[in-house]
Amino acid sequence: YGGVFVAVETSADDQSETVIGYALAASWAYFAQWPIFPFMLARLSALDFEGRAITEANSFQYGPVCVDAAYRGLGVFPRLFETMRLGMCERYPIGVTFINRLNPHSYHAHTKKLGMTVIDEFEFKGRPYYGLAFDMARSVLG
């Protein structure tokens, strides 16, 4: 369950669209094909988010996300995230993602712009990561 959520810009003459960003979100079962996700899933039972247990059934994995450099800082990221949130919130109350701890730009974007909460810190294959969670009932658009 999930999908690719795409942000597009329509040309002034409405004749074409240009992809300016995307976000991927899906069930843990979908992401299980990549080794980091079963590793993260195994850690969930020891974690909670805002007093709620995080499980495979009540959470999903969000990311990666990318916004074209020419459109960064223009509000595309929160609007793209909000589109994803609306597409996933009826099935999952909690979203989970991870960010490399060596990527302060992504950390800032997710914690400050979107209000995500760090719930875990871990290493996988020698790389340090934050695990973050977010409440799917809460809009990021204010």
Predicted regions mapped to residue ranges:
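Conserved acetyl-CoA-binding loop-helix of GNAT-fold acetyltransferases
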Residues: P64-V67, R72-G87, K112
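Conserved acyl-donor/pantetheine-binding loop and adjacent beta-alpha core of acyl/acetyltransferases
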Residues: L24-P64
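Conserved active-site alpha-helix within GNAT-family acetyltransferase domains
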Residues: P78, R101-D120
